[in-house]
Curated annotation (Swiss-Prot):
The protein, known as: Putative pterin-4-alpha-carbinolamine dehydratase
GO molecular function: 4-alpha-hydroxytetrahydrobiopterin dehydratase activity
SUPFAM superfamilies cross-referenced by the UniProt entry: PCD-like
Organism, scientific name: Chlorobium limicola (strain DSM 245 / NBRC 103803 / 6330)
Origin superkingdom: Bacteria
Record keyword Transferase present: no
Length: 113
């Protein structure tokens, strides 16, 4: 069972340094549907979720937005017909932080129901 989604995020101001590669690899094992990518010089978690239509993709986007607002930690969201791409990373840490893995796990939970 994925315990990440039950963990608490820390405020971004306390985020500190980005995670080391070995810690990213360890946490990534708990999120097999997410990929680690580097874009614009920043390491991120990315996953594309699929839906049967735009309405369901938009509803999912809104649920992720509500989650992000509640935690004060915000992803990149790209909503298209039938799919939503979500990217998590921590600007203040300069890459991936444990918060990003926690939020990715919660995002996956929203999709799973």
């Amino acid at each position: 069972m994925n315990e990440l989604k039950h963990m608490a995020c820390v405020p971004c101001a306390e985020a500190g340094s980005p995670l080391a590669a070995d810690e990213i690899d360890r946490l990534r094992q708990e999120l097999p549907d997410w990929e680690v990518v580097t874009e614009e010089g920043m390491v991120r978690l990315r996953r594309t979720f699929t839906f049967p239509d735009f309405g369901q993709a938009l509803a999912f986007t809104n649920r992720v937005g509500e989650l992000a607002e509640a935690e004060g930690h915000h992803p990149r969201l790209v909503t298209e017909w039938g799919r939503v791409t979500v990217e998590w990373w921590t600007h203040s840490a300069g890459g991936l932080h444990r918060n990003d893995f926690i939020m990715a796990a919660r995002t996956g939970g929203l999709h799973e129901g």
